[in-house]
Amino acid sequence: MKVKNSLRSLKNRHRDCRVVRRKGRVYVINKTQRKFKARQG
């Protein structure tokens, strides 16, 4: 999982990427290609 300040570029890496909020943190998840996971921080 990558940790980045800004998730905009990570969201645009794949068309299936979704931005979700869990426990006060912002994540990018991808159900089809799981290597595109990221967390904001």
UniProtKB/Swiss-Prot annotation:
Which GO molecular function entries does the Swiss-Prot or TrEMBL record give? Answer: structural constituent of ribosome
**Which residue stretches, if any, does this entry annotate as coiled coil?**
none
Q: Which organism is it from?
A: Ruegeria sp. (strain TM1040)
What is the protein name for this chain? Large ribosomal subunit protein bL36
Q: Which HAMAP family match?
A: Ribosomal_bL36 (MF_00251)
**What processes in GO biological process is this protein linked to?**
translation
Key word Hydrolase present = no
Provide the family line.
Answer: Belongs to the bacterial ribosomal protein bL36 family.
Keywords (alphabetical) are:
Ribonucleoprotein, Ribosomal protein
Q: Which GO terms describe its cellular component?
A: ribonucleoprotein complex; ribosome
Q: Cite the InterPro entries for this sequence.
A: Ribosomal_bL36, Ribosomal_bL36_sp, Ribosomal_L36_bact
**Does the keyword field hold Methyltransferase?**
no
